[in-house]
């Protein structure tokens, strides 16, 4: 009777390792597809994955083929057209250099793009890869938690670069000893019997021959046990581990004045939802302060920030003054990493824009690690943008970007929060 032992460790997910390798190999194409898909779905929809499309041309495997030119010697079966040492003319074309010309297909046949589904975790990992809070520094109180990759023992699945040779050979030795223990014991007994039989009188040649055949058969069976098996392989394992880091607070300032139409407000909300997902995905215990403003500013909770219908005129400085008050009351700059993200359509009372410049330059920017401003408009820039441009030229911790339509949101977000390298 034959016995089949299922040693697959992935269960139903038999191709988990191949899937991870595929995601790594085509990461740039997948990220491009995600950046296009994010504008077609609700950003708050994180409970599901995403269907990703990759052009077939991008996943074609490299292949070797005969090039044009050169001399080749081949042996062909005989026929009535050629005799020995005849030279055959080279056929025209070939070598993959066709003209590519031809008539269009009437039935529309062709190769579709390769489409596959990624999970929620894979979607968020790719969405926020290589992003980080800028200028984050350790302070006295360490309440915020950041996730980093750490060694976590060994795993039976992985990529060749992470293979542990020593651990794999240890497993190989243990498996071979376990699988051949009974046969080696029997072999030792047969060898002892053969040695004793050699000294007996009279000689028992037939019995000696039988023992030698049994010993040879056992040695063949032991030798057939493979030296290394996929079951023996062990790879260095890495896992995301929470690490204490500096505590931080993010101020979200959103303009909800009458000049902000519904489409502009929706784009601002999408930006802030991306920011919220980024913070909650990559950091723990980050305080988020929501401030809505028109002629007056008010600190609100998350629900009111995203869904309140209140509107009015526009005085941007009211939000900046309120932010300063909150910082003074609750967030000591010596103990907190303070960040701010402001979204507006740029429309502001003309006399208020210089005041915004003054508040930022003298009070807020010296206290914050990073201040980002996004202006959502298709019109030409007004006084607020021009005042902020002078701040950008003066302060390294101030950044500003322009969003014209929905397709700009994700690229602008990545530009504002991309992970800084040593050279920056």
From Swiss-Prot:
Composition bias, Gly residues: 92-101
Disulfide bonds: none
Region annotation Disordered: where it falls in the sequence: 53-111
Biased composition (Basic and acidic residues): 77-90
Classification via HAMAP family: UPF0229
PANTHER family referenced in this protein's UniProt entry, alphabetically: UPF0229 PROTEIN YEAH
Family: Belongs to the UPF0229 family.
Protein name: UPF0229 protein ECA2349
Species the sequence originates in: Pectobacterium atrosepticum (strain SCRI 1043 / ATCC BAA-672) (Erwinia carotovora subsp. atroseptica)
Taxonomic classification: Bacteria, Pseudomonadati, Pseudomonadota, Gammaproteobacteria, Enterobacterales
């Amino acid at each position: 009777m034959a016995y089949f032992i299922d040693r697959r460790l992935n269960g139903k997910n038999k191709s988990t390792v191949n899937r991870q390798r595929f995601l790594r190999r085509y990461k740039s194409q997948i990220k491009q597809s995600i950046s296009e898909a994010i504008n077609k779905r609700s950003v708050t929809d994180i409970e599901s994955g995403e269907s990703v499309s990759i052009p077939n041309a991008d996943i074609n495997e490299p292949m070797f083929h005969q090039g044009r030119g050169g001399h080749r010697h081949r042996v062909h079966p005989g026929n009535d057209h050629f005799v020995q040492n005849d030279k055959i003319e080279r056929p025209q074309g070939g070598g993959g250099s066709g003209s590519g010309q031809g008539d269009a297909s009437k039935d529309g046949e062709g190769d579709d793009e390769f489409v596959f589904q990624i999970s929620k975790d894979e979607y968020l990992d790719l969405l926020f890869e290589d992003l980080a809070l800028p200028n984050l520094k350790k302070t006295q109180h360490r309440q915020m938690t950041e996730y980093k990759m750490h060694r976590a023992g060994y795993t039976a699945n992985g990529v060749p670069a992470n293979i542990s040779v020593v651990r794999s050979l240890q497993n190989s030795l243990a498996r071979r000893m376990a699988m051949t223990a009974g046969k080696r014991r029997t072999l030792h007994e047969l060898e002892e019997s053969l040695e004793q039989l050699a000294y007996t009188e009279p000689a028992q040649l037939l019995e000696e021959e039988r023992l030698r055949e049994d010993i040879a058969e056992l040695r063949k069976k032991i030798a057939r046990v493979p030296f290394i098996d996929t079951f023996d392989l062990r790879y260095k394992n890495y896992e995301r581990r929470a690490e204490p880091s500096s505590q931080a607070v993010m101020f979200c300032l959103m303009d909800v004045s009458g000049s902000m139409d519904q489409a502009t407000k929706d784009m601002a909300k999408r930006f802030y939802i991306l920011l919220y997902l980024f913070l909650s995905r990559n950091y723990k215990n980050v305080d988020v302060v929501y401030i809505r403003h028109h002629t007056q500013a008010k600190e609100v909770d998350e629900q009111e920030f995203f869904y309140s219908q209140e509107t009015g005129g526009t005085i941007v400085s009211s939000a900046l003054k309120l932010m300063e008050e909150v910082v003074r009351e609750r967030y000591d700059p010596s103990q907190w990493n303070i960040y701010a993200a402001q979204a507006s359509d740029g429309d502001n009372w003309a006399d208020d824009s210089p005041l915004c410049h003054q508040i930022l330059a003298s009070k807020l920017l010296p206290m914050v690690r990073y201040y980002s401003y996004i202006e959502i408009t298709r019109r030409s820039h007004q006084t607020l943008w021009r005042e902020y441009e002078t701040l950008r030229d003066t302060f390294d911790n101030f950044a500003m970007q322009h969003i014209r339509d929905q397709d700009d949101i994700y690229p602008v977000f990545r530009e504002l929060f991309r992970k800084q390298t040593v050279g920056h």
